[in-house]
A protein has these predicted regions:
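Terminal alpha-helical segments
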Residues: 1-128
Length: 128
């Protein structure tokens, strides 16, 4: 499950960027550039885990709608988690650079929940 280790590495990198470069003070980050970097890293981790789970090759990326459709067929709760991760990590952090520490923490928690779900699902599949 190389893709799971890689997904966790993306999340760890996002956390490192936020803790060392984004300058947290009073519940806010002060450097939008690093919040954007962290959001993009974390969202890439989510996609890395899902790509490995769905057996996608590295060339090209599926649309967010494709991921939503595939997750919707399998697990409605995980579909909702993915939508929150997309909105928080990709849009609010990655594009807008939302400076709220609470927003960043919520996005990272969603990312970890998705990666853990993929890891659990693959463990179940591997044991069958």
């Amino acid at each position: 499950m190389k893709h799971i280790a890689e997904a966790h590495r993306y999340i760890d990198n996002a956390k490192e960027i936020l803790s060392t470069k984004a300058q947290k003070e009073d519940g806010l980050y002060h450097d939008k550039k690093y919040v954007k970097m962290a959001g993009n890293n974390a969202y890439s981790g989510v996609l890395e885990a899902l790509d490995g789970f769905f057996g996608l090759k590295k060339k090209g990326r599926k649309s967010v709608e494709w991921y939503q459709e595939e997750l919707g067929k399998m697990d409605r709760k995980m579909l909702l988690n993915f939508r929150v991760a997309y909105d928080t990590l990709h849009l609010a952090m990655g594009y807008d650079g939302n400076l709220s520490v609470k927003v960043s923490n919520a996005g990272l928690e969603q990312a970890e929940a998705i990666i853990d779900w993929v890891e659990m699902k693959q463990g179940v599949v591997a044991s069958n």
